[in-house]
Amino acid sequence: MRTRVKICGLTREADIAQAIEAGVDAIGLICYAGSKRYVDLARAARLRREVPAFVSVVTLFVNPAPDEVRAVLDHVGPDLLQFHGDESPEDCTRYGHRFMRAFRVGAAGLDSAGAIAAACRPYHEAAGWLFDSYSSGYGGSGLTFDHSLLAEVQADAGSRPLVLAGGLNPDNIAQALALVQPWAVDVSSGVESGPGLKSADKMKEFLKRIKKVDDDLHA
């Protein structure tokens, strides 16, 4: 099995083209106005049109109003919704669309292996559980966390995909994959030259190192 890769926080057409050339499986568009990588509805729709078949588009929200999500569904047409705030299971399922729920490891109530596993269980309809590190603001933190805290979640997850995020970059991805072996990884700032400005070289190197780990693990 190979590790799937999502690059999040894309804001430019050229970056999408370079991410696809590097071999990414999914791209993330941030629909949360509090993020430095925010794209508005019209911009998100334009960027979505740059994505070819067989590459997924994920739109990220943080505690959105229902009308915001419905507008994105209507005008952008994402393959997957990503909820990265305090959304309840009902908040996530109300749209009848596939979704992924993010958990900020280290937040209150998410600071032990057992607590993290318990927090995930109500979201049994999610297409995946994503694990990021906690920071005082919402959205991606760019920080790493203790990956050993996911052991109990992995035992619980069954066939549900686990997505590892939080401070990943070309220099630390091999170690993270060796410990967790997730279904997918999600990266943003770790492949940037500045907020929302992706580096083609860093994206290529990130994908290259993931492929090497996958090849070594499954040789």
UniProtKB/Swiss-Prot annotation:
Pathway noted in the entry: Amino-acid biosynthesis; L-tryptophan biosynthesis; L-tryptophan from chorismate: step 3/5
Gene of this entry: trpF
UniProt record, GO biological process: L-tryptophan biosynthetic process
Domain of life, per lineage: Bacteria
Name under which the protein is recorded: N-(5'-phosphoribosyl)anthranilate isomerase
Keywords recorded for this protein, A-Z: Amino-acid biosynthesis, Aromatic amino acid biosynthesis, Isomerase, Tryptophan biosynthesis
GO molecular function: phosphoribosylanthranilate isomerase activity
EC number(s) recorded for this UniProt protein: 5.3.1.24
Enzyme class: isomerase
Pfam families, per the entry: PRAI (PF00697)
Cystine crosslinks: none
Entries under PANTHER family matching the protein: N-(5'-PHOSPHORIBOSYL)ANTHRANILATE ISOMERASE
Reaction it catalyzes: N-(5-phospho-beta-D-ribosyl)anthranilate = 1-(2-carboxyphenylamino)-1-deoxy-D-ribulose 5-phosphate
SUPFAM superfamilies: Ribulose-phoshate binding barrel (SSF51366)
Keyword Isomerase among UniProt keywords: yes
Family: Belongs to the TrpF family.
